[in-house]
Design a protein with these regions (language model features):
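Conserved pre-ATP/AMP-binding loop-to-beta segment of ANL
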Residues: 27, 156-175, 182, 206-212
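Conserved AMP-binding A3 loop
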Residues: 39-41, 171-195
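ANL superfamily adenylate-forming
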Residues: 112, 118-167, 182, 277
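Conserved AMP-binding/adenylation subdomain of ANL enzymes
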Residues: 194-212, 220-261, 276
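Gly/Ser/Thr-rich phosphate-binding loop
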Residues: 237, 260-265, 274-335, 347
Length: 518
C-alpha cells in the first residue's frame, strides 16, 4: 500500500498539529466568512481560549458537545477548540428538525450544545425536552440570560498545552444519513483527520499555501469538513466560508469576488450552475481545480462544466465512514462518468453476495480498506459489525471496475433493479438519459407492475418544460435503447418540475418510489 506520509506518534492531537504547522503564518488569513477575516494567529488564540472555556464549564475528556452552527469562523474555532481540549465535537446538519436534534442530544449524551443565534429557536424544543443537564452556548446575539455567550468562552485565558490525546482516541463524531432509520453516530479519531489530508488533500488535489478554497458543501458534512478545514489548514491555505444555502447565484458571487482556486461542489449544484443565466465566464474566475462528490457526476455534466471553466472536475467517492474521498479521478487523467481510481493508501474490493471477488466489468459490492476508517457507530453494535468487517468497510455501494482500474458507480445496494432477470444500474440509465440535450436532470427507480414484475421508470426534468409530452417520452426511450441493452430502457417516463433532494443535493429516489406505489 503506497504511503509517503510518516507514521504518527501514539500521542497525537490533530488541532495542536494544525496550529503548530501554521505558527509561522500568523498574519495570513485562515478563514474568511461573510462578515470577517480570521488570521492564523487569531485562529490559534481563539482555539486555545475556546478549549479553556469548555474546561471552565466542566466539560470532561471525551464528553460530547453538539455543534449546530452555520458556516462562520466560529465553527472551526469550536471544532478545533474541542479537539484541543480532548472534548468530542459533534457537528450536525443545520437543516434538521427539533425532533432530529432531540434524538442526537439524547443519543450522544451531549453535555453542551453550541448553536448559531439564527438556529436557537429551532433547537429550543429539543433543548427543553433534553433529559439530562445541558449547557447552551450561543454564537451571536443572546435571546435570554440563561444561555452562555460564545464570546465568553473566547475570553478565557488560552489553554497552554493540548489535552494528552492518543492518535486513535475518540476525537469527533459525524452523524451519517438516516434515510433508512435514525442517523448513526460515526466515531472518528484524531489520526483519521490527518490521513485524509496526507493521502488525498495533498497528493491528489496538490493543495498548497497559495490556494484559496471554497466548498459549497458545509462543514458539518464529512465532505465539507475535509474541503474547508482539514485539507486547507494542513497546508496553510485560505478558506472562504458561506453561511447561506449554496444556490448558483450565491456560489457565483463568491467565485467572482473571492477568486478561489479550488472549488468543491456536488453534481446537482454543477447541473444548476450550468443552467443558470448568471454562469460566469472563464475570465471572471481563477479556478485551477474543481471537485465533485456526494453522488456520481454525469459524464455530460462533467464535460460541459470543465469545458466552460477551463479546469478539471475531479469526481470521486467518499463516505462518512471513511471521512472523505478514497476513489478519485486525477488531474490530467479524468474519465468523466467514473469515480476514478483508488486514492494511494486505500484498497478496494468488489464482491458478490457470497463474498467472492467479481470479474472485471461485473457489478459488485464495494469494500474499502484504509487508515481513515471510522472506529464504530456509537451504541449500535449490529450496524457496526455489518459495516466494519475487520480491516474492511462495506460501503453499501455497487460498483464495476474496468481493465484500467477505473471504478464506475452502479447505484446503492438498495437501488439496484432486477429487470427481466438481469441487474440494471439506475445510474447507467440516468447517464444515458443525461446525454440527451433536452434533459436537465433525471432519476431512475423500479416500479412493480400488475404482474409483480419490476420495470424501469424514469423521472425527468427538461430544460424546456413545454416540451414535456408523449412524443418526447418516446424520443427519450428510443434514445436510451440506442445506447444501452434493450432490457434497460425506461418503460415509463414521467416529466416533473424538480427532483426531491436531500440537504446535500442527493436525489431522494425513495420518495419517487413512494409515488410509484400510489
Amino acid at each position: 500500500m503506497q504511503n509517503a506520509a510518516p507514521q504518527l506518534p501514539q500521542r497525537f492531537n490533530f488541532a495542536q498539529d494544525l496550529l503548530a504547522l501554521n505558527e509561522a503564518r500568523g498574519n495570513k488569513i485562515a478563514f474568511r466568512d461573510d462578515h470577517c477575516d480570521l488570521s492564523y494567529a487569531e485562529l490559534d488564540h481563539r482555539v486555545r481560549c475556546f478549549a479553556a472555556g469548555l474546561l471552565a464549564h466542566g466539560l470532561q475528556p471525551e464528553q460530547r458537545v453538539l455543534l449546530v452552527m452555520i458556516d462562520t469562523v466560529d465553527l472551526p474555532v469550536a471544532f478545533l477548540g474541542a479537539l484541543y481540549a480532548g472534548v468530542v465535537p459533534v457537528p450536525v446538519n443545520t437543516l434538521l428538525t427539533a425532533e432530529n436534534y432531540g434524538y442526537m442530544l439524547t443519543h450522544s449524551d451531549a453535555k453542551m450544545i453550541v448553536v448559531s443565534d439564527a438556529l436557537r429557536s429551532t433547537v429550543d424544543p429539543a433543548v427543553s425536552a433534553c433529559g439530562h443537564p445541558l449547557k447552551i452556548v450561543v454564537s451571536g446575539a443572546l435571546a435570554n440570560d440563561r444561555d452562555i455567550a460564545f464570546s465568553s468562552l473566547l475570553a478565557q485565558p488560552p489553554m497552554p498545552q493540548p489535552a494528552d490525546t492518543h492518535a486513535d482516541q475518540f476525537a469527533f463524531w459525524l452523524y451519517s444519513s438516516g434515510s433508512t432509520g435514525q442517523p448513526k453516530g460515526t466515531v472518528h479519531s484524531h489520526a483519521n483527520l490527518y490521513w485524509t489530508a496526507e493521502l488525498y488533500g495533498k497528493p491528489v488535489l496538490a493543495l498548497n499555501e497559495h490556494d484559496v478554497v471554497f466548498s459549497a458543501a458545509k462543514l458539518f458534512f464529512a465532505y465539507g469538513l475535509g474541503n474547508a478545514l482539514t485539507f486547507p489548514l494542513s497546508v496553510g491555505a485560505t478558506v472562504v466560508l458561506m453561511s447561506e444555502r449554496p444556490t448558483p447565484n450565491a456560489v457565483f458571487a463568491r467565485l467572482i469576488k473571492q477568486k478561489p482556486t479550488v472549488f468543491y461542489g456536488v453534481p446537482t449544484l454543477y447541473v444548476a450552475m450550468l443552467a443558470a443565466d448568471a454562469l460566469p465566464d472563464r475570465d471572471q474566475l481563477k479556478l485551477r481545480l474543481c471537485v465533485s462528490a456526494g453522488e456520481a457526476l454525469p459524464r455530460e455534466v462533467g464535460e460541459r462544466f470543465s469545458a466552460h471553466v477551463g479546469c478539471d472536475i475531479l469526481d470521486g467517492l467518499g463516505s462518512t465512514e471513511m471521512l472523505h474521498i478514497f476513489l478519485s479521478n486525477r488531474s490530467g487523467a479524468v474519465r468523466y462518468g467514473t469515480s476514478g481510481t483508488p486514492v494511494p493508501g486505500y484498497e478496494m474490493a468488489l464482491r458478490d453476495e457470497h463474498g467472492q471477488s467479481v470479474a472485471v466489468g461485473d457489478i459488485g459490492d464495494l469494500y474499502i480498506k484504509g487508515p481513515s476508517a471510522a472506529l464504530l457507530y456509537w451504541n449500535s453494535r449490529d450496524k457496526s459489525t455489518a459495516t466494519f468487517q475487520g480491516e474492511w468497510v462495506k460501503s453499501g455501494d455497487k460498483y464495476t471496475v474496468d481493465a484500467d482500474g477505473y471504478y464506475s458507480y452502479a447505484g446503492r445496494s438498495d437501488d439496484m433493479l432486477k429487470v427481466s432477470g438481469q441487474y440494471v444500474s439506475p445510474i447507467e440509465v440516468e447517464s444515458a438519459l443525461m446525454a440527451h440535450d433536452q434533459v436537465l436532470e433525471c432519476a431512475v427507480v423500479g416500479q412493480t407492475d400488475v404482474d409483480g414484475l419490476t420495470k424501469t421508470v424514469a423521472y425527468v426534468v427538461l430544460h424546456e418544460s413545454d416540451a414535456a409530452n408523449d412524443e418526447m417520452a418516446n424520443i427519450l426511450k428510443a434514445f436510451v435503447k440506442n445506447r444501452l441493452a434493450p432490457f434497460k430502457y425506461p418503460r415509463e417516463i414521467h416529466f416533473i418540475r424538480e427532483l426531491p433532494k436531500t440537504a446535500t443535493g442527493k436525489i431522494q429516489r425513495f420518495k419517487l418510489r413512494e409515488q410509484d406505489v400510489g
